[in-house]
Amino acid sequence: TSSCAIINGILNNKNLFYHNAVVTCDDRKKTLCQEPITIWFTGLSCSGKSTIANELDKLLNKNGYHTMILDGDNIRLGLNIDLKFSNDDRIENIRRIAEVAKLMNDAGLINIVSFISPLEINRIMAKQIIGDKFFLVYVNTSLEECEKRDKKGLYKKARNGEIKDFTGINSPFDIPKNADVIVDNIDYKECANKIYNAIEKRIKL
């Protein structure tokens, strides 16, 4: 793909050299008194990813942790405003946010990433970039329920052919094979607590 060609071209550029920071990730996490992690939410549009992510953010903040939420729509309105929904652009969308998440982990932060990220191969790519700090949460809300919640009418537009490549309708969603936590969003506070309990020992320094 063209995205891969660009990335490979950059990686093979012999005029670029990686500079190591004087203040290390270990130094930064000691300052913040926490182990950095990227909690990566995946699920259909309207599954409840952002709602649960925000509740988890509140819970972590209440317990003294330093966090940052990276939301799919917000990123597409800023950093990734040049990307659309072709296969190449979807790959680049995930690649960029994974690189941002890695940088934030290097800064000692706990990331909460809320992206549809529908394809298994793209989630694998994100995990390869982020490394062992990657923690996958699958919000397992049915397509029927997501359509009921859709106040923007996006699913209806997709079914009417007004939106192309819409995940769950005319574009696939691969159910994660190895999610660290699966939640169903029946109660978003319970979901946030379940995730918090799963990561609590991991983020304590």
Where are these regions (language model features)?
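Conserved lysine of the Walker
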Residues: 49
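Hydrophobic anchor at the beta1->P-loop junction of P-loop NTPases
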Residues: 39-41
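The conserved Walker
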Residues: 45
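ATP-dependent NMP and nucleoside kinases share a basic, alpha-helical "lid"
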Residues: 78-89, 101-158, 165
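Small-molecule kinase domains that catalyze NTP-dependent phosphoryl transfer to phosphate-bearing small molecules
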Residues: 140-143, 148-205
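Conserved beta-strand scaffold positions in the cores of enzyme catalytic domains, especially
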Residues: 69, 134-138, 180-182
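Conserved substrate/cofactor phosphate-moiety recognition/catalytic segment
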Residues: 54-102, 106
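C-terminal effector/interaction modules appended to NTPase cores
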Residues: 1-33
